[in-house]
Curated annotation (Swiss-Prot):
Note: This protein has four functional calcium-binding sites.
Alphabetical list of PROSITE patterns matching this protein: EF_HAND_1 (PS00018), EF_HAND_2 (PS50222)
Record organism: Halocynthia roretzi
Binding positions (Ca(2+) 2): 57, 59, 61, 63, 68
UniProt name for this protein: Calmodulin-B
GO molecular function terms noted in the UniProt entry: calcium ion binding
Cellular component aspect of the GO annotation: myosin II complex
Function: Calmodulin mediates the control of a large number of enzymes, ion channels and other proteins by Ca(2+). Among the enzymes to be stimulated by the calmodulin-Ca(2+) complex are a number of protein kinases and phosphatases.
Pfam families cross-referenced by the UniProt entry: EF-hand_7
Amino-acid positions noted as binding Ca(2+) 4 in the UniProt annotation, renumbered to this chain: 130, 132, 134, 136, 141
Protein residues bound to Ca(2+) 1: 21, 23, 25, 27, 32
Modified residues (N-acetylalanine): 2
Length: 149
């Protein structure tokens, strides 16, 4: 995972890691993580901080070392890529660019993809994704639909 990072990214992350690693011992503790999160305006609980550490703490020692930090950052960057992909997909469906996917736009794209859907099926797809009930799908609803697997 971390081997897909450029040298520039690794250098950037090393700098960020140093900001977290207040005492310079090469590891980030929950206390150090909390300090940085609070300086960024977040207010995580002790349990949340522990969860964040546990998620990337590969060797189970309760702290994050630099390789574990790199893995975490690489993972986060991967998530950002998929957000960009979702945005692109939304643009494909939103033919007129008004920020909403209508039943007609959905039908058009699905037909181009070789999916012959009845009006009922198209309406059903819109209904499933249409959280606010306005009869069309906005970007937030589209993201929710795409990420709720």
């Amino acid at each position: 995972m971390a081997d897909q990072l450029t040298e520039e990214q690794i250098a950037e992350f090393k700098e960020a890691f140093s900001l977290f690693d207040k005492d310079g011992d090469g590891t980030i503790t929950t206390k150090e993580l909390g300090t940085v999160m609070r300086s960024l305006g977040q207010n995580p609980t002790e349990a949340e901080l522990q969860d964040m550490i546990n998620e990337v703490d590969a060797d189970g020692n309760g702290t994050i070392d630099f390789p574990e930090f790199l893995t975490m950052m690489a993972r986060k960057m991967k998530e950002t890529d998929s957000e960009e992909e979702i945005r692109e997909a939304f643009r494909v469906f939103d033919k007129d660019g008004n920020g909403f996917i209508s039943a007609a736009e959905l039908r058009h794209v699905m037909t181009n993809l070789g999916e012959k859907l009845t009006d009922e099926e198209v309406d059903e797809m819109i209904r499933e994704a249409d959280i606010d009930g306005d009869g069309q799908v906005n970007y937030e609803e589209f993201v929710t639909m795409m990420t709720c697997k």
